[in-house]
């Protein structure tokens, strides 16, 4: 898989929108923890999860999920958002923060094949 011995590749698939429930928050906390522990993490945003990568989030009285996603990217996570899912929700590449790339199901399939573990939120 191309990673040093002892390092797992973990793909985290997030389908939940931010702020409606805590699944997306839990997914990002999981991903950040895995990164801090030295694992290789790939985050795929799908369905309403694509809103996690949208610029300009500034929620009141709850943790800012976008800041967590940015921390994951800073720690080395590769992040992709489903292009068709984004388009269906009125989002284009310009709507996403730096470090989030639009992708396809082919990209997700390749990540799953390359991963030691896949977790779906």
Swiss-Prot record:
InterPro entries the UniProt entry points to: DsrEFH-like (IPR027396), Sulphur_relay_DsrE/F-like (IPR003787)
Pfam families: DsrE (PF02635)
Coiled coil: none
Domain of life where this protein originates: Archaea
One GO CC annotation: cytosol
UniProt family annotation: To M.jannaschii MJ0989.
Full protein name: Uncharacterized protein MK0008
Organism: Methanopyrus kandleri (strain AV19 / DSM 6324 / JCM 9639 / NBRC 100938)
């Amino acid at each position: 898989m191309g990673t040093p011995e002892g390092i797992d590749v973990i793909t985290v698939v997030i389908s939940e929108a931010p702020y409606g429930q805590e699944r997306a928050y839990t997914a990002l906390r999981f991903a950040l923890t895995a990164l801090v522990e030295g694992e290789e993490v790939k985050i795929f945003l799908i369905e309403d999860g694509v809103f996690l990568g949208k610029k300009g989030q500034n929620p009141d009285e709850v943790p800012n999920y976008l800041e967590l996603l940015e921390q994951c990217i800073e720690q080395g996570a590769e992040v992709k958002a489903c292009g068709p899912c984004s388009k269906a929700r009125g989002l284009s590449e310009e709507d996403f923060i730096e470090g989030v790339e639009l992708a396809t199901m082919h990209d997700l399939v390749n990540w799953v094949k390359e991963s030691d573990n896949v977790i779906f939120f």
